Amino acid sequence: FDDAEATTPVPALVASRLEDERVIFFDKTRSDSTVHRRGRLDSVSVKLLDERARVIGFGRFVGVLTNRAMRMRPSALGILAARRARVVEALGTEPGSHTHKLALEAYDCLPLEFLLPAQLEDVRRVVASVVSAAELSQIEVVSVADPENRSFFVSVVLPRRAYEERFRGEIDRLLESRHAASQIDHRTSFLDEDLALVHFFCACESDLAPGALEGLEVEVRDLVE
């Protein structure tokens, strides 16, 4: 930053991160991977600090998460373990209770691609939906937009007995045809053998318009009910 012209405008994304308390940021870039697997390249940005703890720039690493990393429990990463504690605290569950333990497991079922860039409140909403689906044996759908990165995340949780493999393909087609998803990564996992979780990470070619995901949760629910 010291070498930048005083009149050079600061990009909106950089400005927002300067005010953000986080030090590490994870994004999906707008460039496609040409190795390892199909999809958007991953980007990790780290704030660079001077001896007085002032931000003087960002370091950036671009690549793709390895299959091993994608299979890791999120709480095995220090930065995400700390966030898990904050998310569960925000839910207000009683430590040691069934709901508290369920919330911890629900967090660890979420994909790294969502947890690393997501805001705390968005993670809390998704974890709360998993807990609700488990305790009430019902279908829960939550969508989270990330306009800065032209992407969005969809969490679909339903009783395992109601889960069918065809749902993923049908939801993929819906996301592509009605919500302009150009690339879709999905993960399927099961919680306590009673709950199926299907998560979709979607990248778009153009900017997400305000209200772009309006109606999406109802549309997805209609497909799986």
Give the ranges of each region predicted by the language model.
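Non-catalytic interaction/regulatory segments
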Residues: 1-225
